[in-house]
Amino acid sequence: MSVPSAIATPIAVAATPRASRARGGVVQGRISKSGNPLRVAPRANRRPVASPMAARAVATGPDGYSVDGMGCAELDEQLWEHEGHLKYRWEKFQERKAAIADAEGSLAEFAKGYTKFGFNKTASGEIVFREWAPAACRAALIGDFNGWNPDATHLEKDEYGVWSVTLPAGAIEHGSRVKIRMKKGDGGWVDRVPAWIKMSYSEPGVMGANYDGIYWDPPEHERYARKNPRPQKPPASRIYEAHVGMSGLEAKVNSYREFADDILPRIKDLGYNTVQLMAVMEHAYYGSFGYHVTSPFAVSSRCGNPEDLKYLVDAAHGMGIRVLLDVIHSHVSCNVEDGIAGFDFGQPTQDSYFGEGEAGYHWLWDSRLYNYENWEVQRYLLSNLRYWVDEYGFDGFRFDGITSMLYNHHGLQMEFSGDYNQYFGFDTNVPAVNYLMMANDMLHESYPGIEVIAEDVSGMPTLCRPVREGGIGFDARLAMAIPDIWVRLLQASREGNLRDEDWSMHDIVATLCNRRYTEKCIGYSESHDQSIVGSKTNAFWLMDAEMYEGMSTFEEASPVVDRGMALHKMLRLITMAIGGEGYLNFMGNEFGHPEWVDFPREGNQWSHDHCRRRWDLADTEYLRYYELNNFDRAMMNLDKRYEFLAHEHQWVSTACDERKLIIAERGPLIFVFNFHPTNTYEDLEIGVGMPGKYRITLDTDAWDFGGKGRVIHDAEHFTNPGGPESWVGPYEQEPRPCGMKVLSPARSAQVYFKVPEVEDPMKAAAAAAGVSEFREIRVSNAGADGAHSFDRAAAPTPPPAPAGGRPRGSFYDPDNVDPDFAPRGGMNSSQFRAAPVPPIAPSNYAAPQRREIVDDSNIDPDFRPRAPANFGASSGGSPPPPPPASNVVSPVRRKKVVDPDNIDPDFR
């Protein structure tokens, strides 16, 4: 979640020193009184803020670290008002880091505790077990290996409260059960799962069965060996949030290997470059979504064993996909019989993993909270991070719920207004902040390409500034206010309290762009939080029960489905366009998954029916879920092609409440959003930052995505000097350098790219061959990667072709040409400069055309072609003339079988 700051936001729209209010712990932004945007100067032209406080010199040491922790104040003058607090937390961070280096060698070595604690083997094969339990009076290792005899394997305690024992090689069999038995100060004995255990297990199907630790030491031939290198860190992360257990189509718990084999290819096909895995750390209660962790070092045994998880991560790397772990260091399950919570005997804080009183308990989550100031707890948590990276190959982390860590009040019953006094004072949990600084410092120093993301609802300043500047060190934060505004708008519309005509473009832009300069955000329109039972996904808010009855393309969409399809695409696209420097989606939401997530529980008779993903809906071509899935693929590959998420040029030029228009520039792209339910704008003049020629590269209204096909995709739009003169929106501080005219249909969005102004080798070759007229033929690769990346071809001057352009709203493949095709007449507005379509010359093809064999025995008698309702009516144009008879879609659908061995080399 992000909060306003006094400095310019990355996107050039309203940024204010304060937010107006907070709803449910989430800051709601407002716009400055002037309504004018704050713009970001080019990096080379930036100057210090004109303030005596902001102009203070920031000193750095020879190691590049800030001398006093005030480097983060260089870009935020409000931080100087809290200089004392920031210097204090920096001093404490440096003190502990120096003490660790003195005692352990370095922070990185300190974080290798998993090689010393728990079960480890010496070079000679002996088994060494160590456990930190200073409150225990006596301890013994028990398990299958010694018949659970508490007198067989006693542990010895050192001066630091560490118990240990060394066993002969082979004394414990791989896969056998183990526990530690400890005597408490009151004389009682307890059996506990070792805190550093690598795997734990509970008998499936047995109600109330407790977990046992599992000694995991497979023989060499059973160990998984990595085959693929880590993918490089992408310019911007397109994150697919996934839960392995509920990722299958069948009503069961899916496995790590099934996810790797069946789901990862889907993620790759959609164009995501990162997968964020939930519920990997062992948790006793499946319905907790993985957030009530019992054993932080153990993999969730429901989905497989450690070698299976290594297979998954390596398979992702082989596909070029990075893997983030949803790590939970903000709290831990209270289940004393199942995990680390059992090591609390009521001892003093200095001898415990957990704090005392309110410092050690989160009443809303019913969870224990770590004692972040304790030396051994810091070792435990830092080593936990390094273990997942070193042992399994994870590429980063998403830190869950760190608001609970940042403040002594844990964010409970708090409304964060953006006032800096809420962030820097006695409410701040400085030891927890220092732990997060050490975690990020260790991770980024040890693994330069790692990515660490924070989930924080408070908007803590400096959260995503480097540790060397005095920041907390995260790479990005989740923009948690964005899904809230969509839920608020969609719920109000569904309940009849807000018309679409009354949506505020001003509020939408303010929320999506409300983030602190230089602190990156991951934008998302919805996540697992909106998918869980009791909440609703955007698709469910939009279409409700009609998602079950009105999604067949054999029938005309109802008004509810038509609206839902259009807005589902628009909400996701605008979130990605201006909502952050990265993007996240929860699995299934990309195609509007119609069912909520309800884990097996007593209330649903322990059913898995709603704890799975209906991939079959996205794969069925005659369902509208298939079209939404296609759009998500195209949206991901839009960034893959243009890298606009990582681009520094970000500018929202227009947010017009009267016309319901939002226009933004991001990198080389122009985004035009028309949220009006009925008004289509022809010859709409929009401001553009760079002069030149533009074309559409993505259209929510395209036929391929379940749209109405109201826009001609191959039209060329040329800019004119001077900004738009027809009107200036309330967000436009001044007209843009130039303008161009576009068609903006109701409830749709189009993305334009600037055609590079370089000498075209294809045109040069055509001119050399005596071709007087040149036309680009766009070969859509949408079926392969969804990005609409195009090859190009030139043709000699053809004989006169029928008037008009190619069909609007469709991308087609010139390798599959109907020689009898005559294009329909289209809307020829003055802004469209399209040459007639020439026939394709055979010399333009790299491969010969294949003949198509039609199987007349495979006919769908119920197939009826769809036709756009009231084509052209919304834009004021007349309906196009009917196409020639040879162009009319057959009233039956035939299966086309391509014979690759049947090639016609003379095809024309």
Label every PLM stretch briefly:
Residues 1-41:
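N-terminal chloroplast transit peptides
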Residues 50, 54-240, 256-271, 560-585, ...:
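Carbohydrate-interacting/catalytic domains
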Residues 131, 180, 242, 277, ...:
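Generic structural signal for small/hydrophobic residues in well-ordered secondary structure
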Residues 200, 221-239, 243-428:
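Substrate-binding/active-site clefts of carbohydrate-active enzymes
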Residues 239-250, 293-296, 360-373, 418-420, ...:
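Short glycine/proline-rich turn/loop motifs
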Residues 263, 308, 312, 377-388, ...:
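Alpha-helical packing segments of well-folded alpha/beta enzyme cores
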Residues 393-395, 410, 415-608, 640-651, ...:
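Conserved alpha/beta catalytic core and glycan-binding cleft of carbohydrate-active enzymes
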